[in-house]
Amino acid sequence: MIKIFNTLFLLLISNLLTLSNLKSQDNLESIIDQKKRIEFEIDFLNRNNYLSVSKDHIFLLRENESEKNLKWNIKLLDYNFKSINDTTISLDRSYFINKIDEYKGDFHLFFKRNYSNDKKYLIIKYSSQKGNIIYREMNFPLSLEVKKVLYFKNYFVFLSKANNSKNLISIYNIDNNQLNNIYEFMNYDKNVLKINKINSLNFDVIVSEENSNGLKVISRSIYDLNGNSRDKIRIENKDFSVIETRFLENKYAISILSNKRSRESVGVQYNKLDNNIAVSQKVHLFENLNSITTLTNYKKTKRSKFRIGELFYIDSLSIYDNKILFTIESLKSDDNNDGFSNYQYIPFYNTYSGTYDRKINPRFGGYLHNYFMILSFDYDGEIVRTHAKKIDQLQTFEKKIYIEYIFGNDYHLSSYVNKGKIFISKHFNKIAAEDKEYTYDIETFDNETTIKTETNPEGTYHLGNKVFITYGIQNVKKINNDRKRVFFINKIEIID
């Protein structure tokens, strides 16, 4: 009898503790406010939806079937989702949108014309203020895959890749329709990693090449809009390959390092610059950073060799509170998918043919994001603080950085949105303080229930301060049990 009583008493206490925990979790204050939501129903003829933002507006482009042509519906919204303008254009269905870029509040839509041997392109400029549209068709002399476009007042600058995998940079004069090609990178074993706009008159070209020892080095040259180069700077290391470099204020450069003939990241390099010359250098290997070795359970011995097995990409480089903050994120392709995956297809469906228009590698399972790091440096290149985190189950269709950051004096915030959930972490700047983790579902309207959130497309934009918008596609059930598929945009504010 006593044993039975004791057992019942323990069960009662256990249940009370469970109820108490649930209650305390329910009473926890949320650190986010999901302020607004807008939905656009996806019907039979809707193929795809694209989104971009400027400092004042949200730009939504919806692609719809229309017999022989495709109709592109442009919706311009303010940050409170109020409609500013609604326009529809019609294009031949051979046009495939490549990218949307914002320049001085206007949006540029860059289309490639399929079946044109990669020579014909179209740029449509949409003016946010006037609501008008300007079309500009271009014919390149070579078959090119355009990787990046920079927009200037009277010029376009293109970074392209030819069929032989060599790079070409082209400067297009809008006033006279003349194309000035920079052939330097077509003739040498150089890989142009990216081009960046510096100001209204100049852009830089970041190049990767091998030195005589077989190690990769990074160089940067500045070009004017006539194609003249100047101020070349070279970043290298005698023991490691320099895989990627980010420059800050022409005073600092921070790079990701790898071993020879490998892209797996092994550390970072800090260079101080003076008059386009690296005057100092400090190397910080991952095996010496406790924040990352702790995550991987690495124990240093004479025989053990640290290897994280990841490719890190630079996300941001900035100055906050007299410290240089450097953020990186790992990204690698999952090519071992054995069954059907959402990541096998470019995400639009041709309702007339009944098939997906474009299929990629059937074994492609998306891009895996496994780790990210925040590294804080002083101006001499010494590490002040590091935060490293293992990311759980972040898998994306697009090869792009996903983590957003907000830096603060007491702590830094990192966040990302994936598969219908919002993930936020607080990384405290005090050494002994542990990170805090928060997870929330993307909220729908009160009369709806989310059945599934798709991963393709999805994305997040930081609007400033602690306000974000996130977008994607959801399958929802209404209160009357009707189901629909919607493209949604949610506005989120971190209120902590």
Question: Residue spans of the language-model regions?
Answer:
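A short beta-strand motif characteristic of beta-propeller blades
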Residues: 31-42, 83-89, 132-138, 178-185, ...
